[in-house]
């Protein structure tokens, strides 16, 4: 890992409200370094503008992103909303909605009653058949 990633991670983990110690209280190393290095270190140490990013881009905090996407429980707000408004619709409106939604699927329709077939009776009587037999077959 690079030093900048570690530094950024430590900045995320430090408690909010706790900043860096003032420069007078920071423990410094021996002062044998050239003046240019100390100046460069002071410039990069502050939480200033990150020069390594694209122009206009803001560096996002991972913790803030996590809190944005964390699941929120809306139960209390929903219960309050549902219980506060006791608006009951008219009977005619509810009946109209029910009739519009009913009967579109075949399973919602009541079964049609089939008519019972009556046994087919003959129009002719037994006497008519005998008469026909005599005429057709010639049986006396």
From Swiss-Prot:
> What does the record note on quaternary structure?
Part of the small subunit (SSU) processome, composed of more than 70 proteins and the RNA chaperone small nucleolar RNA (snoRNA) U3.
Q: Report which residue ranges the record marks as coiled coil.
A: none
The record's region (Disordered) falls at 1-52, 95-123
Q: What PANTHER family does its record include?
A: ACTIVE REGULATOR OF SIRT1
What is the protein name given in its UniProt record? Active regulator of SIRT1
Task: Kindly list the biological process annotations in GO that this record carries.
Answer: ribosomal small subunit biogenesis
Question: What terms describe the molecular function in GO for this protein?
Answer: enzyme binding
Report which gene this protein is encoded by: RPS19BP1
User: Where's it found, cell-wise?
Assistant: Nucleus, Nucleolus
Source organism per UniProt: Gallus gallus
Per the record, GO CC terms?
A: nucleolus; nucleoplasm; small-subunit processome
Biased amino acid composition, Basic and acidic residues: 108-120
So what does this one do?
Answer: Part of the small subunit (SSU) processome, first precursor of the small eukaryotic ribosomal subunit. During the assembly of the SSU processome in the nucleolus, many ribosome biogenesis factors, an RNA chaperone and ribosomal proteins associate with the nascent pre-rRNA and work in concert to generate RNA folding, modifications, rearrangements and cleavage as well as targeted degradation of pre-ribosomal RNA by the RNA exosome. Acts as a chaperone that specifically mediates the integration of RPS19 in state post-A1. Direct regulator of SIRT1.
InterPro entries with a match to the protein in the record: AROS
